[in-house]
Amino acid sequence: MLVDSHCHLDRVSLKAYDKDFAAFMTATLASGVGHMLCVSIDLEHYPKMRALVDPYPQVSVSVGVHPNETNRQEPEPDELVALAADPRNVAIGETGLDYYRSEGDLAWQHQRFRHHIAAARACGKPLIIHTREARADTLRILREEGAREVGGVLHCFTEDWDMASQALDLGFHISFSGIITFPGADDLRQVAARVPLDRLL
């Protein structure tokens, strides 16, 4: 059985399925994908996302606000914990830091990230981490906020082995995407080859 550990089912293109989500899900499940984790990127669309996947027990959800989502409702830890009480919820995120797409004073990203970690610790659920060009600050905040207690995954990892090894030491898993197949991704493939199989997604 295949498990898709990170998807956004509420944002998938349905052109090939005549805009029929049920047809898309039928085809996906028939292809051998047995379970999916539908990952939240903001709170405004979370109720709609949750309702969309409700008929499908093969889909779990997470709750969180992506670091690139600006002008969004800022999540308070208590609110995230309340939403995470849903039996179908298995994680907090996606959250983290992104210095590639965001500019200026990013203190708000740091605060948002800390709120997610606090929520994860409060409800005992793992974190889904998005990090891009923010290695030192991501690791520092994970340590400062005690993220080791809950662990989680660094999703769509594109950083170096030094960051991967430190994340592994903090109890996290490392997830790679199709980027590792790109011709110029030799360094990333070398990182993937060093991640223990039981910590690799």
Language-model segments: residues:
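Mid-domain alpha/beta scaffold segments of enzyme catalytic cores
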Residues: 1-201
